[in-house]
Every structure is written in C-alpha cells, then in structure tokens.
Regions:
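A polyampholytic, Gly/Pro-enriched intrinsically disordered region
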Residues: 97-108, 190-194, 219-223, 341-356
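N-terminal phosphate-binding loop and adjacent alpha-helix
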Residues: 26-61, 96-99
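Glycine/Thr-rich phosphate-binding loops that ligate phosphate moieties of nucleotide
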Residues: 1-30, 35-36, 66, 70-96, ...
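Glycine-rich phosphate-binding loop of actin/hexokinase-like ATP-binding domains
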Residues: 76-97, 125-130, 134-156, 197-271
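Phosphate/pyrophosphate-binding loops at sites that engage ATP/ADP/AMP, CoA/4′-phosphopantetheine
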Residues: 49-66, 113-118, 157-167, 191, ...
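Generic structural marker for isolated residues within well-ordered, non-membrane alpha-helices
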Residues: 52, 107, 129, 154-155, ...
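Gly/Ser/Thr-rich active-site cleft segment
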Residues: 8-10, 98-204
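Short amphipathic alpha-helical face segments that pack within enzyme cores
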Residues: 46-50, 105, 109, 208-210, ...
Length: 367
C-alpha cells in the first residue's frame, strides 16, 4: 500500500509515492506556470495529473494508492473559486487587532483586495485545505495541535465587529491524522485513481517537515533549507529567547525552537555556515541552561540534501554528524506519516515517523 503525498510550493508541486514501510517509490517535482498568481491554485490539480502520468510511465507496477495526503506553504489564502493570495505577498491592512495569528492578517488583506470575491465565496482556505476541498468537496481547516489555535483564530477574536462575517467563511478545525474526506468520483476519473480514496491533510509544510525528519522527541534536531534556512530543536519546556521562535510541537507537551536564517540561499557558503553556527551555539546554550542534552546528529532536508560536498563542510564546521534521509523532501515523508497514522497503521505520529523516516547516509566531522 502506498500514499500519494503532495506538497504545494509557491511555484511548484512536489509529489511522492511512499509505502507503509517507508520506501520512496517515486518522487517528482513540477513547476506550475500561470501569467498571474491570482488563480495559481487552479493549476495544482492539473499539475498533479501531469505528474501522475509521468510517474505511471516510469513504473512497471500499479501505484496501489491507499490514501492521499496534502501539505503546503502558508499562510496562502484561497477562495472557494480558486482566487489566491500567496503567503509571500505583503499588503498593508487596516488597523485590526489580530493577536498572534499568522492567518488573520492575510484573511483581512484578502477581504480588502478582493471584496467581490470575498462576498461571494462560501469558504476561505489555506492552500493545502483548498486542495483537500478540490479533491473531496469537504471544507476543513487543519489545526496541527491544540496549542496552535492562537496562530490561527478563535471564536472570541472573530466575534469582534471588525471581522464581520469572516467566522462563517472559515471551515471547522480537524485534528492531524483525521480523515478529511474521500476522493470524489469526477476528480478520481480525471486523475485516473480509484474513487473514495481517503484524503488527509498534514497542513503547513513546516509541520510536515518536522514530522518527516522525526523531530518529534526531546533532543531531536533538524536543519530545513530552501530559500531560507531553519534549525529546529525539539524540547520539553517552553523557552523564550530573542533570537529564537518558539512554537508547539505536534506532540503534546513538547515544543519546537527555531533559529531562522532568512534568504540563506542568497548568501555565500561561508556566510551561511557562520549564520548556522551562530544558531547552533545559541541552541546549545539554551540546552545547557535547561539541563537538556544537545544532540550530536542533525537531520537535514531540502535542497542542501543533494550537495554532499557542502554538507561535509557543514559537518566539519559544526562538529556534528549530519544525517541525510532516503527522501530529500521531508514534507512528503511527513505527509505519509500523517496518512498512515490516520489509517490506523500506527498508534501515533511518532510511531509512524519512527518507522517511515529512514537515514540513508551519515556524514561525520573529519578530525
């Protein structure tokens, strides 16, 4: 049995076929092209179809898809009709108190920019949830863990008059691992898949990557890179630091400490290493102050996973072992973990990650 894993990027779709024993059957990335980003979400389904055709041509056996699992960037906002406000588009909004929410400022911006579409749209989604809606006709919002509620919204803040009827347009929360719906017949025919395949949502790509690197227990650490880079350290105490972003883990009672290097892809290798080194030292200091053991091994994901020469240089510089997993795109493995957990193949997300996340190569610092 395999899960069809889909991670929605800003300009491309990553698609993986991953088995219940963690085998990466196939991975493909394909750009979606549109003259404007305003309806870019409408390209996702056609891009997925194109990728599935390519994957089927490359395999000699049936895909045997038992579930579909979706993750993606955010907070991207999409209307029921596919009008899209990407996460990286910044607009000034009216002075509305949105607390610590990552989504409400974007939702307000959508309302102000696209007033007519806002009025006629039954729902407003984040990107992955819109794709779930497209596949199943079910409207949901994935809440990674109950403590994330302030990063989304709650009834109290939505009752403020400034938000008008926004509450009516936001689909209900579902838990990670909860079935979001089933593939409807028309979409199944279009994609040439079986009808009623269960569909799951792993939510934000950040969450999917933490699951897909198994950064789900105290002392685990991962380095996720793309246009920017982040070191993520799992701890069992809520810690605040001026240079660290603290967020809940998807595992209750655990927390994730993130040290971010914005636009790291534009930096030279040496400057990148210095920035990451600074982050590692800060996290080590935090670990020492809180009687936590700092790990000797760090899991990497993203584009850097393919650059063994740079990773060896990073291992030497940080004096840490670097683990490269059998899938360079951890989000896809995270998607698979969510689906197989939802299908009751595992008792917890952590059990799923323990089984599906596989180290392929370990680089050790040279003396």
């Amino acid at each position: 049995m395999n899960v069809l894993c889909v991670d929605i990027g800003t300009t491309s779709l990553k698609v993986g076929i991953i088995s219940e024993n963690g085998e990466v059957v196939s991975v493909l990335k394909k750009d979606f092209i549109n003259k404007t980003s305003k309806f870019i979400a409408e390209k996702w389904l056609f891009t997925l179809k194109s990728v599935l055709v390519q994957i089927e041509k490359s395999l000699t056996h049936n895909l045997d898809i038992c579930a579909i699992s979706i993750s993606g960037n955010g907070p991207t906002i999409v209307s029921s009709g596919g009008l899209t406000l990407l996460w990286n588009k910044n607009y000034k909004i009216q002075n509305v108190q949105t607390g610590n929410s990552l989504f409400l400022p974007k939702l307000i911006a959508f309302k102000e920019l696209f007033e007519k579409e806002y009025s006629r749209s039954k729902y407003l989604f984040s990107g992955p949830e819109y794709f779930v809606y497209k596949l199943t006709e079910n409207a949901i919002t994935l809440l990674p863990e109950n403590r994330y509620i302030n990063a989304y919204w709650n009834d109290k803040i939505l009752s403020e008059k400034e938000f008008g009827n926004l509450k009516e347009k936001l689909p209900p929360f579902v838990e990670i691992g909860q079935k979001c719906g089933e593939l409807n017949s028309d979409i199944a025919k279009f994609l040439k898949l079986k009808e009623k395949i269960p569909v799951f949502c792993a939510g934000p790509d950040f969450i999917a990557a933490l699951i897909g690197t198994n950064t789900l227990e105290v002392g685990k650490i991962c380095d996720r890179s793309g246009s920017s880079e982040g070191i993520n350290f799992c701890v069992n105490v809520q810690i605040f630091h001026s240079k660290i972003r603290t967020l809940p883990s998807v595992v209750p009672n655990l927390w994730n400490l993130s040290y971010l290097v914005p636009k790291s892809s534009k930096l030279s290798e040496n400057v990148r290493l210095e920035k990451i080194g600074e982050g590692i030292e800060i996290l080590k200091e935090i670990a020492n102050k809180n009687n936590l053991i700092f790990p000797k091994r760090i899991h990497v994901t993203g584009g850097q996973s393919k650059d063994l020469e740079f990773l060896q240089k990073k291992s030497d510089f940080l004096n840490l072992e670097i683990a490269i997993c059998n899938c360079n795109d951890a989000e896809l493995v995270g998607d698979a973990c969510v689906a197989f957990y939802g299908l009751k193949k595992f008792n917890s997300l952590k059990d799923a990650a323990n089984s599906l996340v596989k180290e392929d190569l370990i680089l050790k610092p040279k003396k």
